[in-house]
Amino acid sequence: MEPVAIYSRTQERADEFAKQHGLPLAFSDFDEMTQKVDAVYIASPTGMHHAQALQALEGGRHVLGEKSMGASLAQEQGSYRAAKERGIIAMEAMRHLHTPQQQIIRDALPMIGTIRYAHIQMLQYSGRYDQFKNGTILNAFRPELGNSAIAGIGVYCLEFALDLFGEPSSYSGNSVYLSNGFEGSGAIQMSYDSMIVDLAYSKIVQSVSPTVIHGEKGSITIN
């Protein structure tokens, strides 16, 4: 794969990025850019992911999209459906699922016997939260742009659990919302036939506690 083009909402910023990274093409028109490439990597704000992905897919271009591919289940399904109809690829960029570390964890699961419980967490105090508390609401804390704790950070816990354990038989969850409706923290419990998996995620508290998977013969601790 060879990066050849960049799109930005302003030509000046596109030109600056292209020069900095040695890209031959720079665009401020998304449609024009998609006509010059074979595939598109979408790393814009979450609220724009679906529209841009659909635009590229409808133009016959493969899409690798930053998480989440859409601000809702319907949007995500719409992108994958558009790709399937055209025989092209739409894929969410979940890099950590394809790392050697993730494979080590997969390989270690049988060593701890029948798994009964797992606690998976990512609690990371956002550097933008202090500004929110002081009255300045930056884009990362604006729910109208498709942003939330689950979309920004909780998705890593969720995809990690689904990769290791598959889909649960049932699930439930609760969230903590800030004054503007932004989801600041959340917790999900996933129930399986013989085990329970708890997920915790936040952009407004910090924790260094590890993720732990407990089996009948031992446990796996992940820092």
What are these regions (language model features)?
Residues 96-169:
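Predominantly a Rossmann-like dinucleotide-binding segment in NAD(P)-dependent oxidoreductases
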Residues 157-223:
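Contiguous beta-strand/loop segments that form the cofactor/metal-binding neighborhood of enzyme cores
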Residues 14, 52, 79, 105, ...:
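Aromatic/hydrophobic pocket-lining residues that form π-stacking "cages" and hydrophobic walls in ligand
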Residues 21-82:
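Beta-loop-alpha module in the N-terminal Rossmann-like domain of NAD(P)-dependent dehydrogenases
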Residues 27, 65, 90-92, 222:
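Hydrophobic residues in well-ordered beta-strands that form the structural core
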Residues 3, 77-95, 114-117:
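Rossmann-fold dehydrogenase core element
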Residues 2-5, 38-40, 90, 147:
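Short active-site oxyanion
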Residues 1-21:
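N-terminal Rossmann-like dinucleotide-binding module
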